[in-house]
Amino acid sequence: MPEKEEFKREYLESIAQNCSKPFAECSRMERYIALAAMIRECCSGVRAETLRRRAANNEKIVYYFSMEFLIGRLLENYLILLGIRDMTAEMLADLGEDLDALLECERDPGLGNGGLGRLAACYLDSLASEDVPCVGMGLRYRYGLFRQRIQSGRQTEEPDDWHADGYPWENAVPSEAVDVRFGGHVERREENGRMIYELCDYQVVRATPYDVPILGYGAHAVNNLRLWRSGPVHKQLDLDAFNAGDYSRALKANNDAEAITCLLYPDDNTPSGQRLRLQQEYFLVSAGLQSMIRTFRSTGLSWEHLPERVAIHTNDTHPALCVPELMRILMDEEGLSWEKAWDITCRTISYTNHTVMPEALEKWPVQLMQDLLPRQFQIIEEIDRRWRESFDTSVPGWHARQQATAVIGGGSVRMANLSVIGGHSVNGVAALHTEILKNTVLSDFYAVSPEKFNNKTNGVSHRRFLLQSNPGLAAYITERIGDGWITAPEKLEDLLAYKDDTESLRELAKVKLAAKEKLCAYIARDFGIACSTDGVIDVQVKRIHAYKRQLLNAFKILALYDRLKDDPDAAVPTSTFVFAGKAAHSYAFAKESIRFVCAVADLVNSDPVVSKHMKVVFMENFGVTMGQRIYPAADISEQISTAGKEASGTGCMKFMMNGAVTLGTLDGANVEIRDRVGAENISIFGLTSEETERYTTQGGYNARECAESDPVLARVLAHLTDNSLGSRFWDLEDALLKYNDEFFVLRDFAPYLAAWDTLAAETGNLSFHRKSLINIAKSGWFSSDRAVGEYVTDIWHIR
């Protein structure tokens, strides 16, 4: 990399080129854009060399299809990966500019929602750092999911215009645009003894790629994230309608095409919403596969070699249409037989399942699929027919198993079944999750094809969530064990040598305090709530959902509130409870949960006695950058989902990496955290997955009985409807008592409160900091470097 003066000269040239005026006259946003453009150009040079080297070595490429890529801000991340963050800060200081202020100009790209998208981004980071050829295939959403606002305690949604000021990291590639076809009908004819299928009277949408460089640590390799934007093939204007004043009809064709990539996850509670969702999924698949095929064709190899040169990975079921679409291309466009096309498809495609909740497994109405994708539906029908015929009818129970695993059933196309049948690998994302898939959710498939199933426990980028997010802790670690952990995170275990070193534990406490001071200053500035830096910082940040049980956390806070109202001198540690996360636009229960948490916050924060001991903060519009502010400061990581419902979770890993101690159920990755840190360095409570499954399938759970037998809980529940919160929450009470508490909030309340009391009382002690250090030391296994290494070896067969 260049020396500072050379770097400064190049930066000022970038200012002149991008802003056409002197540095002193540029706004801070313009200065940021010029710096980002300069770093992107640096990435482009590395990318060209990476492509040349890989082509010479005939390397296999992973195409990672995902509806979400939550990549977060890139400038600081790339300065760190290039090893020039400090030099850049000095260079800017020489020019009278502050790097930290400049970094705040960058907005989080609205390319995802939660763990699914952040996992994909972490994997891209690790694949580039490990020099594994990969192209991420996603959509370039105009307005993302939404920008969350909390107004009078209620979530409201606004469009997230994340690239209103431009996005300097992307590069449009119109020369590689492709056309995607929807609707129409299929005509069949025979030519030279072969059946030809031709789609007629279809609508065409243009897919234009925007490439974002994905830089690996040390700048040894750059991969590509290709985001597709939808639009009309030609801009169309109905002049008659326009001149008649019907402007919406005049632009309808343009608007319909652009709507496909307008928003992430449009509401699918209406037929038009379902249609748009399915259009999104096929648009991604069609555009991505066309791009992949363009690259493969350049090798000159025959199609039989595709599985040797390409791995297509589908991140959840959203890209499941890769199966029939690849079949269509191989048969209809390349002339392969069904048998050859099927063999190639199955050996090329693999699938990650991300849910244990059957209702969350995607299904699409047969009629919708038939209308929107007529040829693909024909292929799906044939896949279904051949699958059904493969069953041995002499085996007892064959019919029930056939019905459970069929692609088409109950008037729907089952995308998870399509993904399992049409690929060579199905993986869960935590050991417990994979066992649940084998034993319940996908048990019939496991009985038929056990060799397809494997576990790949999730991982997160320690370079993003430790090295970048927590520079104080990173320096603390490097001072003791060197910097080898940055590229070999398993070396974090060397920290265990300091677990009984009093001075090191005290230094670790100072690092945590500095992180708390930073977070509390941010909360005071942006949310107007003054929090204590000396007390416990207890955090639950994740998507708002009934099974994630934000209600349970809020009930605990109310129990502590009641305790302090009875006795202001009660032994309740000074605490700040932090919540963040979005509720899906149409998910009423989740929105009501946010309103409830905000009402609890108002009650606690406005009470002159209780607020001296506790504060509650709901931080609106949670995203990657906000998470990076929060993770370093947390003492207690709330991972309290109903056991058996969380596939894995990655927030738990980010908190662990930053020294928080997990308070959680035996669910998802919590199980593996416990196995690595030891039961004494994590706080586990509540029902197990076996117990929740038994209650669900056999009955015997009585929520009302739980409420009536526990006076503390009964008093907490009274807050729901006694107007002490300034409002009544009848729907929440009904969910718990009338509908028997589907997620066992009331059953787990008492052990949860007891576990919190014990853990919170220990924070601040050397024994707690010892637990914290052990968690950091054992977090290396949860790096995405380890996870992608397993995918590379076991699923994609690259090395």
What residue spans do the PLM features occupy?
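A conserved ligand/cofactor-binding region detector
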Residues: M1-R799
